[in-house]
Amino acid sequence: MAGETVITVVGNLVDDPELRFTPSGAAVAKFRVASTPRTFDRQTNEWKDGESLFLTCSVWRQAAENVAESLQRGMRVIVQGRLKQRSYEDREGVKRTVYELDVEEVGASLKNATAKVTKTTGRSGQGGQGGYGGGGGGQQGGGWGGGSGGAPQGGGAPADDPWATGTPAGGNQGGGGGGGWGGSSGGSSGGSGGGYSDEPPF
């Protein structure tokens, strides 16, 4: 949506992700990321850590379950989402403001680690962020080679999410939309785009 602050944070998980379910059954995982800037001091010839930024993150639905199953305390992660500000009064009546991240994408950093990714089946019907080269049209299909047949799908935060605002990105207007590598795009070439292809998207 227009006017939202989208940021990407790279840091380490402070705790294991905490998975919970709303009364309607939607999964939500909360976790905290510590991002610490490092600079090289030429005088002492060593790296120095700056002040850490601690950010509480929340991710919804199938992605929440995937995060809870895949990530652990101490792992280095890359998190992208919408920065939100929330104000409240503490027990002493002092007004406080916190910043939180409503996560769109999250993954392990492979700078100093390896990972084997396993694609999950879409149980939650979450709409789509396409993978590399995700197609155009109304709704985008997901991942490497996934395609949507033009049927509108649910997306965004669940109905009982207090931060939900308006229609999710993509508009849920149907119209098809290929996903990722090997997927078809909007009504072109007639393929369903369901299989994996080694062909790069460019």
Curated annotation (Swiss-Prot):
GO molecular function, one term: single-stranded DNA binding
Gene3D superfamilies for this protein: Nucleic acid-binding proteins
Key words, A-Z: DNA-binding
Gly residues bias spans: 124-157, 168-196
SSB domain span: 1-110
GO CC, one annotated term: nucleoid
Chain positions covered by the region annotation Disordered: 115-202
Biological processes, Gene Ontology terms: DNA replication
A Pfam family per the record: SSB
Family annotation (InterPro entries): NA-bd_OB-fold, Primosome_PriB/ssb, ssDNA-bd
Subunit structure as annotated in this protein's UniProt entry: Homotetramer.
Alphabetized NCBIfam families for the sequence: PRK07772.1 (NF005851), ssb (TIGR00621)
Protein name (Swiss-Prot/TrEMBL): Single-stranded DNA-binding protein 1
The organism of origin for this protein: Streptomyces avermitilis (strain ATCC 31267 / DSM 46492 / JCM 5070 / NBRC 14893 / NCIMB 12804 / NRRL 8165 / MA-4680)
Source species taxonomy: Bacteria, Bacillati, Actinomycetota, Actinomycetes, Kitasatosporales
